[in-house]
Amino acid sequence: MRPPTMQYPEPAQSDRPAAAAARVGIRTPAEQEAMRLAGRLTAEVLDMIGPHVVAGASTDELDRLCHDWIVDRQQAVPAPLGYRGYPRSICTSVNHVVCHGIPGDKRLKQGDIVNVDVTVIKDGFHGDSSRMFCVGKVPPHVQRLVDVTYQALWRGIRVVRPGARLGDIGAAIQSFVEGNHYSVVREYCGHGIGRGFHEDPQVLHYGTAGTGMALEAGMTFTIEPMVNAGRREVRLLPDGWTVVTRDHSLSAQWEHTVLVTDAGCEVLTLGAGERPPA
């Protein structure tokens, strides 16, 4: 069944038409190189902004720093700005905000957790990634949510290879998250990415192994699980963008863009010094 209609990206659908498979792009070697560049620049923005995610900083200030870096330093384009009317260059989702939080004058405080979501367009291709940042020291139960979500992302990444199915990704993430007594948001999902910001296929973060589209070398898509400390239900605020947990529980998200290769997959948005969890 189809979940409620929401925006940015398209709502997750478990019943996508089979015809969607015909629309999934297989990147040429030249396009793969362009995707690597866009991914590298996206990771660079997140590396840059990390030290600025501190108590007293406003999310609008973070947006301005990222915008200027992308436009002035990278000679690139912040994809979210103006996308379907979105008013800022990044998304900043604090505490119980699940995704698509709009930067504003809200100032961060000690103990907050913040997801910063960055998408860069360079030479016509997109890179998309998000990271969690903790403002100062957070309680152990909060750190655990952040860590489990990161591990869940990598559980999904590790099953990506030619011949694997989209359902394998969702099943790996869902079983790990629920095994750690958290819940997976179902209304939003990963997506194909390339010349378009949001392309086919949709990459659900829940599902059944062995189902869904078979992966092929040359596909590029995001994996971006949103994990709630409480129940999985979310609601959309009147601004039309900000998604929050219905029960006001904390939520965390991590995202990478991946390329399916003959040998498995390549993560295009790795941060400086980032090492996959054991």
Predicted regions span which residues?
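Active-site neighborhoods and metal-handling regions in enzymes and metal-associated proteins
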Residues: 1-278
